[in-house]
Amino acid sequence: MPVPSIVPASLRLFLINEDYKEKGNPDLKHTVADNLDLRYEFFPKSSEQFMVGMFYKKLKNPIEYGLLNEGQDTYYKPMNFGNATNLGVEVDVMKYFNWFGIKANYTYTHSSITTEKRIMDGNDVKACTQTRPLFGQAAHVANLSLLFKSTKYGWEGQIAGSYTGKRLSDISNWYDDDIWEDGYMQLDASVEKSFKNGISLFAKASNLLDTPLIRFIQSGPRTENVNSERNNGNVIERKEWHGQSFMLGIRYKL
């Protein structure tokens, strides 16, 4: 039986990907959010829908993760950098044409937070501010699914694609030195065949495109002399492939 930790989470310290030490923050404040949502929904049939909405969120003390220099060490820790706002629109549609259907949704979010930064001016370090999106908030998120369903013949399947736009991955206390995660696409597929005796066979495939996850620092004065792999001029901090996965199975329903 595992022994529960008696060390508060806010005080723990350990390595994160062997790059930086992760450190808790006992001074972290809770996030308080004020939300305003406006939505219109229409359901022509039980299997069809149309939705369009607008939203506004005011976030006080949102919790973001960033890299902070303390003496000679750099720590990865949760912090409150200020107050933020999220404003956006979303659209969701699902429509069937006999055995074939389409389900799609798209969300645009304008995210904004102004934080204190440091910048080099010659040999001097000066304080400044910078307005940026909220940590982990992509401006564009979209999903599209092609659906296939035949109750008569016992077939059901879908091909689903998703896109997540560029977003902040780690916050730096230096101006224009944040680490970003590049936009990426994912494609999944599944199919299932049901039989009258309660048995069904299914197959699933995930991450068919195997799009790499790219983390980068945007090109600027601080990266001019960095000797590293680049993508569109940006310095690549990390590139990962998570691989494809496949599954075959059988189900039985009483």
Predicted regions and their residues:
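A surface-exposed, glycine/aromatic-enriched loop/edge motif typical of exported proteins
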Residues: 1-5, 44-46, 214
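C-terminal beta-signal and adjacent terminal beta-strands/loops
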Residues: 3, 58-60, 163-171, 193-254
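Outer-membrane beta-barrel translocator domains and adjoining extracellular loop/strand segments
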Residues: 6-14, 18-21, 62-70, 109, ...
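Outer membrane beta-barrel strand-and-loop segments of large Gram-negative receptors
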Residues: 25-29, 35, 42, 49-103, ...
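Residues on the lipid-exposed face of transmembrane beta-strands in outer-membrane beta-barrel proteins
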Residues: 28, 38-42, 89-95, 104, ...
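Strand-connecting loop/turn motifs
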Residues: 45-47, 95-100, 139, 150-154, ...
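Gram-negative outer-membrane beta-barrel transporters
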Residues: 55-59, 77-171
